[in-house]
Amino acid sequence: MNTNEELKDITPVNYWIGKENKISAQHLQNGERIVIVGFGQSMTPILKSGQPVLVEPVTEETKLSKGDVVFTKVNGHYYLHKIISIRNDKSYQIGNNHGHINGWVSRSTIYGKMVKKL
């Protein structure tokens, strides 16, 4: 499938890592796939600063695994970071790609999962 065709129904949303971004979370909670552009070095080399990624909503059926890059809210801040550890399939430890741990979250605060780098 052509990338333009893949993205024709996508909501574009830019976001700064660590800043409040209720709009992105709301789009994902409404079942919309979104494009997020994160900025900063916390996820290099997995993601480069300014690199757009396609994020799909997390539903009850979504499989979440260690290493997945997710859009989540931790301690009042939104991040596009990865799952570091999983406890009992209910709690997820979120951190960046350089060893910094943001904290533990429940599945209900993981709004989206990165499915493709653009």
What is each of the regions a protein language model found here?
Residues 1-118:
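Extended hydrophobic leader/signal-anchor segments used for secretion and membrane insertion
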